[in-house]
Amino acid sequence: MVKIGVIGLQGDVSEHIEATKRALERLGIEGSVIWVKRPEQLNQIDGVIIPGGESTTISRLMQRTGLFDPLKKMIEDGLPAMGTCAGLIMLAKEVIGATPEQKFLEVLDVKVNRNAYGRQVDSFEAPVKLAFDDKPFIGVFIRAPRIVELLSDKVKPLAWLEDRVVGVEQGNVIGLEFHPELTDDTRIHEYFLKKIV
């Protein structure tokens, strides 16, 4: 039985839990999804999702709760991880616009610009092209970060908005600018689950 953890410190945690449950069901995989708040819960999981929210807050709370160091090591050791929006920022190697107290997991060789699309009012939805499926995916961008550079050839584009990369994959790690959990389309969560089973 597969167990997926969603880092539940701040952000759209319940939406990711529901989307992952639906994806498990659609794939016919027996599994469960847990809300991770403490480091000892990390030992129970086969994959982790870092949701959107506010990256400064998520970074601070991950350090305060003791999740940061063990999670970083587990991802470096091969734990499948997916980060959306602020979760992408947390996974990134380099972050433009970071505050001095922010710490990042640095497990994804990308440079991201923290609030590249501007304020909440500039949020938008647009069709995104996926590397693994011909049908477009509706990308929900909410004060999204922007992937400005791929820092190694280990990083593979996974999603495009027109000709710009908005989602990437590097081994066991997926990072997305947008929020797949805010749609009824579970294809990205299913793709992530297939990395685990």
Curated annotation (Swiss-Prot):
Amino acids binding L-glutamine: 53-55, 114, 142-143
One term of GO molecular function: pyridoxal 5'-phosphate synthase (glutamine hydrolysing) activity
EC number: 4.3.3.6, 3.5.1.2
SUPFAM superfamilies associated with the record: Class I glutamine amidotransferase-like
Biological or metabolic pathway of the protein: Cofactor biosynthesis; pyridoxal 5'-phosphate biosynthesis
Known function: Catalyzes the hydrolysis of glutamine to glutamate and ammonia as part of the biosynthesis of pyridoxal 5'-phosphate. The resulting ammonia molecule is channeled to the active site of PdxS.
Keywords: Glutamine amidotransferase, Hydrolase, Lyase, Pyridoxal phosphate
Subunit structure: In the presence of PdxS, forms a dodecamer of heterodimers. Only shows activity in the heterodimer.
Residues at the active site: 85, 179, 181
One GO cellular component term noted in the UniProt record for this chain: glutaminase complex
Organism: Pyrococcus furiosus (strain ATCC 43587 / DSM 3638 / JCM 8422 / Vc1)
Name of protein: Pyridoxal 5'-phosphate synthase subunit PdxT
Any one of the GO BP annotations: pyridoxine metabolic process
Alphabetized Gene3D superfamilies for the sequence: 3.40.50.880
Catalytic activity: aldehydo-D-ribose 5-phosphate + D-glyceraldehyde 3-phosphate + L-glutamine = pyridoxal 5'-phosphate + L-glutamate + phosphate + 3 H2O + H(+); L-glutamine + H2O = L-glutamate + NH4(+)
Protein family (similarity comment): Belongs to the glutaminase PdxT/SNO family.
Domain of life, per lineage: Archaea
